[in-house]
Amino acid sequence: MTISNTAKITPELVASHGLKPDEYERILKLIGREPSLTELGIFSAMWNEHCSYKSSRIHLKGLPTKAPWVLQGPGENAGVIDIGDNQAVVFKMESHNHPSFIEPYQGATTGVGGILRDVFTMGARPIACLNALSFGAPEHPKTRRLVSGVVAGVGGYGNSFGVPTVGGQVRFHTRYDGNILVNAMAVGLADADKIFLAAASGVGMPIVYLGSKTGRDGMGGATMASAEFDADSEEKRPTVQVGDPFAEKLLLEACLEIMANDCVIAIQDMGAAGLTCSAVEMGAKGDLGVDLDLDKVPTRETGMTAYEMMLSESQERMLMVLKPEKEALAEQIFKKWGLDFAIVGYTTPTKRFVVKHGGEVKADLPIKELGDEAPLYDRPHVPSPKLPVIHAREINAPLSVPDALEKLIGTPELCSRRWVWEQYDHVILGNTVQRPGGDAAVVRIEDGPKGLALTVDVTPRYCEADPVEGGKQAVAEAYRNVTAVGGKLLAITDNLNFGNPERPEIMGQLVGCLKGISEACIALDSPIVSGNVSLYNETNGRGILPTPSIGGVGLLDDFTKSATLAFKAADEAILLIGDTHGWLGQSVYLRDVCGREEGAPPPVDLAAEKRNGDVVRGMIHAGTATAVHDISDGGLLIALAEMAIAGGIGATLDPAPDSTVPHAWWFGEDQARYVVTVKQDDLLGVMTKLKTVGVPCTQIGITGGATLSIAGERAIEVTALETAHEAWLPAYMAAKN
C-alpha cells in the first residue's frame, strides 16, 4: 500500500532514531517499502533496548520464574504471587536512569509514577514503594544537585500520591559520575482471582484512552533510554516526562472502580513509548490487530502530528480494551473522577497495526513483528577474568580496630541514610510496621496478622569483581534481609543496570550476573516474577559498575512477631551465626581504610545461606531472638555498631580468636552471617539446637553499658558512634560546591 511521507528517510534520520543499518534493512524487507516518518518512529520505539530487550532476552529466558505461589511471571506489567486467603501481592522494579540524570526531579517523579501504574494496572492497590539510588563520587560537581533533585522527586511523587516509601539503597561511586541510577519498586495488594492482564481479546472491541491529555513531553524517551550519553546529553531535557501525582491518584481510583464494575477486557499503562507500546503490546499479546484514530486522542497542545502523538510519553495515561456493554458506565466513572475517556480505536482480526490521523493512514505495520517478534541478538560476550584471593594476613592494618570503626561508620558508604528517608512519608496509610533504617521494611497486610518484608539489594563492587558471585550475593543479601525481620522470601523482581552490551566484556558481566542470580533464586526457592533491563549506562565510553538491583518480597505469618536490629536490653548474649574467615577482598575496609579496591569478592555458599536463614527465622518465630541483624557491608563490627546505635545500648565484646587476623575478623565481609541476641535463660538451649543442626554459632559478647568495647581495645561511646554515623550526609548536602 502507499502511505504519504512528509520526510525523506535518510541514513542520518534512521541513526537518530537509534536504529542500526541492518535493522533498517530488516524493516524494508518486512514491510516491502520505505516506512513513513511515523512508522520509523514506531519501529524505533518498539525495537529499542528499553522496550524489546533485544540484547538480553535470550539470556533472561534462563531465569527461574515458576513456583506454586506464582500467579503471573515476567511478561506482564508486574509479577503476581499468591499469599493465601485470596490475597495476591503485585510488584515490580523499573529504572528511570537517563531521564533522572538529565532532569533529576522530574526524572525521579515519573519513575515512581510509572512503576505505580504498572502495579495498579494489574488491579492492585499500591501499598509501598522502595528505591535503589546510585550517584557519582561525592566530590563530583554534579553529585550534590543530582542527589537533591532525585530524593525530592521520589518523595514529592510518593508523598503526594499517598503511598509510603519504606526502604531502599543509596550509594556513591565515581563510576556513576556520568550515569546515575534511579531504580523504583512498587508493591500492591489485589484479590488473587481479580488480576487484570494486557492481552486483548475479541474482534471489534473498543479501545479506550484513559487519564491525562497527551502533550509533547517525553518525546523519544524510550529511545534515549537505549543509548549512551555524550557531552551534550544534558541538552535533552525535552525528552524528560513531567509527572502529576494528583492526576495519578485520580487515575488509580478510576481504574480500580471500573475494574470492580467488570468493565475491563485488557488494560495497559502508557509508559515507555507511550501510545505505541501500549497499543502494540495489547494487540500482539492477544493475536489481534489494532486500528487507532488519532483524531480521537485527547491532546493538550495544538497541531500535534501523528508522529508526536504516537511517541509522546506524557504521564498518567492508560489504554484499555473495554467490554462494549459497559461503555456508558466506564465513561461515567472516569468523568466522575475528572479524567479523559475517549474511544480511540478497535481491535481487528488482521494482526496489523493501523494508525490514522486527519483522515489519512499514517502507519500500517505487522503487529507481531513490532511486539514479541522484535529483533533478538546473541551478542558476543567474554567472562570477567578471575581476580586473586586476598589473604587477610597480607593486609597490614593502618589503624587500630576502634579507629577503623570510627572512620568507617561515618563514610559515604556506611553512614546513615536518615537525611534521605526522612524526606519520604514512610507511614502514610498506617500500615508500616518497620520503617527505613533496618534490614527490611515490614508492612502489615490490611489489619493483619500477615505482613510483607520488603528489601532492595545489590553490591556492585562484587558484581564487577566477579559477576557470577556478585549476582548470587545480591539475591542472598535480599534473602538475609527478609529473614532478619522474620520473613520468608517468596519471589524477587530485578532491575539489571549495565553498560554498553555491544562491548563483549560488558555483555559478559550481564551474562555472569544472570547466571549467579539464577543459581541463587533456585537454591533459595525465590523465583523472578518481574523485572527491567537498563543498558547503555555509559558516558563517553565509561560504563557504570554492573548493578543488578534485586527487589525481594517476603511473607510474615504474624507481623507482630517481626524482629528488629536494635539491642533490646542489657545482659543479653550476642551470638555470631555463620562461618567467619575474615574475607577482605572487595570489602569496604580494604577500600576506605587501606585504600585498595581489589581482590576477589567473598564467595557465596547458597546451601549455608539457606540453612542459616532457616535457623534464624525459626529463632524469631520461637521468640528466642531478641534482636537480629544480617552482616554485610563493613562486616561484623559495623553490624554490631548499628545494633548498638539503634538500641542506645552498648556491648562488651570478646577479642578476635587467636587463630584469626583481628581486623579481618571484625571487618571481613564473609557471607551467610547474622548477629543475634538472646536472653541468658535461652542461651544454652539455642546453642545446643544450633550445634545439633550444624549451624556455626559463637557467643562473642554481652549487651549493656554505654560503650562498644572490645577486650584489650579502646572503648567507644555509643553516642559518639551515633554522631559519626548521622553526620556525613546532612553535612554534605548542606555544603556548597
Swiss-Prot record:
Residues the entry annotates as binding Mg(2+) 2: 118, 269
Entry binding sites for Mg(2+) 1: 94, 532
Gene Ontology terms describing biological process: 'de novo' IMP biosynthetic process
CDD domains reported for this sequence: PurL_repeat1, PurL_repeat2
Major localization listed first in the record, in broad terms: cytoplasm
Keyword line: ATP-binding, Cytoplasm, Ligase, Magnesium, Metal-binding, Nucleotide-binding, Purine biosynthesis
Positions of substrate binding: 95-98, 117, 241, 313-315, 534
Cell compartment(s), UniProt: Cytoplasm
Enzyme Commission (EC) number: 6.3.5.3
Source species, domain of life: Bacteria
Function: Part of the phosphoribosylformylglycinamidine synthase complex involved in the purines biosynthetic pathway. Catalyzes the ATP-dependent conversion of formylglycinamide ribonucleotide (FGAR) and glutamine to yield formylglycinamidine ribonucleotide (FGAM) and glutamate. The FGAM synthase complex is composed of three subunits. PurQ produces an ammonia molecule by converting glutamine to glutamate. PurL transfers the ammonia molecule to FGAR to form FGAM in an ATP-dependent manner.
NCBIfam families: FGAM_synth_II, PRK01213.1
Subunit and interaction comment: Monomer. Part of the FGAM synthase complex composed of 1 PurL, 1 PurQ and 2 PurS subunits.
Similarity comment text for this entry: Belongs to the FGAMS family.
Annotated protein name in UniProt: Phosphoribosylformylglycinamidine synthase subunit PurL
Organism from which the protein derives: Rhodopseudomonas palustris (strain BisA53)
